[in-house]
Amino acid sequence: LTCVTSKSIFGITTEDCPDGQNLCFKRRHYVVPKIYDSTRGCAATCPIPENYDSIHCCKTDKCNE
């Protein structure tokens, strides 16, 4: 499985997930209204949202773009 780890105007960076991590995730952490910080990567289980986080998990290559 290949997941996106970062995304910018220059393109995307990906990583091949290690054995046992068969999910990609994208976490959006809301800093202030209309401004958020995104974290992407591989995971064994879908992370639990905290505070004002929004989390998307998926199981196909680069699905967390």
Swiss-Prot record:
Q: What is the effect of changing residue 54 to V?
A: In AncTx1; 2-4-fold increase in inhibition potency on ADRA1A and ADRA1D adrenergic receptors and 17-20-fold decrease in inhibition potency on ADRA1B and ADRA2C adrenergic receptors
Which GO cellular component terms are attached? extracellular region
- PROSITE patterns in alphabetical order: SNAKE_TOXIN
| Keyword line | Disulfide bond, G-protein coupled receptor impairing toxin, Pharmaceutical, Secreted, Toxin
Cross-referenced Gene3D superfamilies: CD59
Q: Could you tell me in which tissues this protein is expressed?
A: Expressed by the venom gland.
Which pairs of positions does the record mark as disulfide bonds? 3-24, 17-42, 46-57, 58-63
Q: Indicate whether Disulfide bond appears among the record's keywords.
A: yes
Location(s) in or outside the cell? Secreted
Outcome following mutation: residue 59 to G: In AncTx1; 2-4-fold increase in inhibition potency on ADRA1A and ADRA1D adrenergic receptors and 17-20-fold decrease in inhibition potency on ADRA1B and ADRA2C adrenergic receptors
Instruction: Give TM segment ranges.
Output: none
State how changing residue 12 to V affects the protein, per the record: In AncTx1; 2-4-fold increase in inhibition potency on ADRA1A and ADRA1D adrenergic receptors and 17-20-fold decrease in inhibition potency on ADRA1B and ADRA2C adrenergic receptors
Coiled-coil region list: none
Secreted recorded as keyword: yes
* Membership in a protein family: Belongs to the three-finger toxin family. Short-chain subfamily. Aminergic toxin sub-subfamily.
Stated role:
Orthosteric antagonist of the alpha-1A adrenergic receptor (ADRA1A) with an affinity of 0.35 nM. Also has affinity for ADRA1B > ADRA2C > ADRA1D. Acts as a relaxant of smooth muscle. Reduces prostatic muscle tone as efficiently as tamsulosin (an antagonist presently used), but with fewer cardiovascular side effects.
Misc. remarks from the entry: Negative results: does not show interaction with adrenergic receptors (ADRA2A, ADRA2B, ADRA2C, ADRB1, ADRB2), dopaminergic receptors (DRD1, DRD2, DRD3, DRD4, DRD5), histaminic receptors (HRH1, HRH3, HRH4), muscarinic receptors (CHRM1, CHRM2, CHRM3, CHRM4, CHRM5), and serotoninergic receptors (HTR1A, HTR2A, HTR2B, HTR2C, HTR5A, HTR6, HTR7).
Task: Specify the protein name.
Answer: Toxin AdTx1
Q: What is the taxonomic lineage of the source species?
A: Eukaryota, Metazoa, Chordata, Craniata, Vertebrata
